[in-house]
């Protein structure tokens, strides 16, 4: 599972997720991508479950890029603990994902296999998603 090697502070503020993602909105590495339509925290377990679902369906063919990383710790206090007495103990790691962020990319498999693999991965995630294709940017041509 994905966890940071080391962090400066074990406990973080929750923060808030307003607006859309600033970067990572397009398919950069693969041919197809899974884009978030809503914002949410995605845990390292959910990322791993989505990755396993994709790679199993693709029968270890093709390549998968995970473009999110769970760098934020979340805490919780024990059951029956009274208010106060400081912040709770770190329980796990989450990746804050804003809407329009491309979370996973796939390449090296046929279109129908890629779409089904990404659909299976989307079922494991707590956000609404859509499958997008790589947009070929019209660059300079060496014609004429």
Swiss-Prot record:
UniProt xrefs under InterPro entries: Ribosomal_uL16 (IPR047873), Ribosomal_uL16_bact-type (IPR000114), Ribosomal_uL16_CS (IPR020798), Ribosomal_uL16_dom (IPR016180), Ribosomal_uL16_sf (IPR036920)
Q: Name one GO cellular component term.
A: cytosolic large ribosomal subunit
Which pairs of Cys residues are joined through disulfide bonds in the record? none
One GO BP annotation of this record: translation
This entry's Gene Ontology molecular function terms read: rRNA binding; structural constituent of ribosome; tRNA binding
Q: Which domain of life is it from?
A: Bacteria
Gene3D superfamilies assigned to the protein according to its UniProt record, in alphabetical order: Ribosomal protein L10e/L16
Question: What is one Pfam family matched by this protein?
Answer: Ribosomal_L16
**Swiss-Prot/TrEMBL keywords:** Ribonucleoprotein, Ribosomal protein, RNA-binding, rRNA-binding, tRNA-binding
CDD domains membership: Ribosomal_L16_L10e
The family note in this entry says: Belongs to the universal ribosomal protein uL16 family.
Q: Quaternary structure? A: Part of the 50S ribosomal subunit.
Q: What does this protein do?
A: Binds 23S rRNA and is also seen to make contacts with the A and possibly P site tRNAs.
| Protein name in UniProt | Large ribosomal subunit protein uL16
- Organism, as annotated: Pediococcus pentosaceus (strain ATCC 25745 / CCUG 21536 / LMG 10740 / 183-1w)
Recite the lineage of the species: Bacteria, Bacillati, Bacillota, Bacilli, Lactobacillales
